[in-house]
Swiss-Prot record:
<feature type="binding site">
    <location>
        <begin position="25"/>
        <end position="32"/>
    </location>
    <ligand>
        <name>GTP</name>
    </ligand>
</feature>
<dbReference type="InterPro" id="IPR005662">
    <property type="entry name" value="GTPase_Era-like"/>
</dbReference>
<dbReference type="InterPro" id="IPR004044">
    <property type="entry name" value="KH_dom_type_2"/>
</dbReference>
<dbReference type="InterPro" id="IPR006073">
    <property type="entry name" value="GTP-bd"/>
</dbReference>
<dbReference type="GO" id="GO:0003924">
    <property type="term" value="F:GTPase activity"/>
</dbReference>
<dbReference type="Pfam" id="PF07650">
    <property type="entry name" value="KH_2"/>
</dbReference>
<dbReference type="GO" id="GO:0043024">
    <property type="term" value="F:ribosomal small subunit binding"/>
</dbReference>
<dbReference type="Pfam" id="PF01926">
    <property type="entry name" value="MMR_HSR1"/>
</dbReference>
<keyword id="KW-0690">Ribosome biogenesis</keyword>
<feature type="binding site">
    <location>
        <begin position="72"/>
        <end position="76"/>
    </location>
    <ligand>
        <name>GTP</name>
    </ligand>
</feature>
<feature type="region of interest" description="G2">
    <location>
        <begin position="51"/>
        <end position="55"/>
    </location>
</feature>
<keyword id="KW-1003">Cell membrane</keyword>
<feature type="region of interest" description="G5">
    <location>
        <begin position="165"/>
        <end position="167"/>
    </location>
</feature>
<keyword id="KW-0699">rRNA-binding</keyword>
<keyword id="KW-0963">Cytoplasm</keyword>
<comment type="function">
    <text>An essential GTPase that binds both GDP and GTP, with rapid nucleotide exchange. Plays a role in 16S rRNA processing and 30S ribosomal subunit biogenesis and possibly also in cell cycle regulation and energy metabolism.</text>
</comment>
<keyword id="KW-0342">GTP-binding</keyword>
């Protein structure tokens, strides 16, 4: 018997818990920021713009008593109907199918019809924990107003529990972990204790570039783009990464590149620095732009992209 098997058996005997936790909510309520704080490391991209998360991202947090496997989902889309958004909504539904706990995230003092649409998608026989995020905002600093808001949302659904947090500042994150833990099944850990994601380096590189696109472009343009890793080569002390950004029109390509190529250069430089920090190695990054008209409504092409 190897040491890992022995330790896993010891943990099971001590009531160790391990399970899957889906983080869901309408776009832009802070789901990705919340997951990054829960696992203690940035692996899911964040932006003030909606729909930055397109793929389900698995983050893992392990302590002495439990292992939490978090699934960060795209924000459920009720606007901008196209094949891409239909596929993103299907991703949310699929993510809910095999989890032990659902964390439903709403923005403090703001419960909308879009939140209600997400609530209707939640499973009836899986524990759902309400998380009220952004309690650092001025309107949420009144304790009595916040308590009234939580009561209002709890009246909409049979939640197993509720917690108010600030994902941005990491407030009450430890409390949330303790709230989730009893709903995880008793089990040995599924992943090594030092593992924080099951996603590949290629996937993480792609996500970093997408984050920079959302950060440095306008409100609409990033939604008409997709990022593809064309080549990823790992050498001794250097990762060579070649990434194509797919756009719908030549005019979008010009906007992305910017005057004299300055915008694309800035996006590429910041993405490279983030990759070097994440991968703990030097990175050579080449980013270029390709035009493919109508890609967001091409179902076959979306399947090829894994969406």
């Amino acid at each position: 018997m190897d040491i890992e098997t022995f330790l896993a058996g010891e943990r099971a005997a001590d009531g160790y818990r391990c399970g899957f936790v889906a983080i869901v909510g309408r776009p832009n309520v802070g789901k990705s920021t919340l997951m990054n704080h829960l696992i203690g490391q940035k692996i899911s991209i964040t932006s003030k713009k909606a729909q930055t998360t397109r793929n389900r991202v698995t983050g893992i947090y392990t302590d002495d008593t439990a292992q939490f496997v978090f699934v960060d989902t795209p924000g459920f889309q009720t606007d901008h109907r196209n094949a891409l958004n239909d596929r993103l909504n299907q991703n949310v539904t699929e993510a809910l199918g095999g989890v032990d706990v659902v964390v439903f995230v709403v923005e403090a003092m703001r419960f909308t019809d879009a939140d209600r649409v997400v609530l209707k998608q939640l499973p009836k026989h899986t524990p759902v924990i309400l998380v009220v995020n952004k309690i650092d905002k001025d309107k949420a600093k009144d304790r009595y107003a916040l308590e009234a808001f939580v009561a209002q949302v709890r009246a909409e659904f049979e939640f197993a529990a509720a917690e108010a947090v600030s994902a941005k500042h990491g407030l009450r994150i430890a409390n949330l972990l303790e709230l989730i833990k009893p709903y995880l099944p008793e089990s040995v850990p599924m992943y090594p204790e030092d593992m924080v994601t099951d996603k590949s380096a290629r996937f993480l590189a792609m996500e970093i570039v997408r984050e920079k696109l959302f950060r440095y472009l306008g409100e609409e343009l990033p939604y008409a783009m997709n990022v593809e890793v064309e080549q990823f080569e790992e050498e001794d002390g250097l990762n060579r990464i070649y990434i194509a950004v797919l756009v719908d029109k030549e005019s979008q390509k010009a906007i992305l590149i910017g005057k004299g190529g300055e915008r694309l250069k800035k996006i590429s430089t910041e993405a490279r620095l983030d990759m070097e920090k994440l991968f703990d190695t030097k990175v050579f990054l080449k980013v270029w732009v390709k035009v493919k008209s109508g890609w967001a409504d091409d179902i076959r092409f979306l399947r090829e992209l894994g969406l």
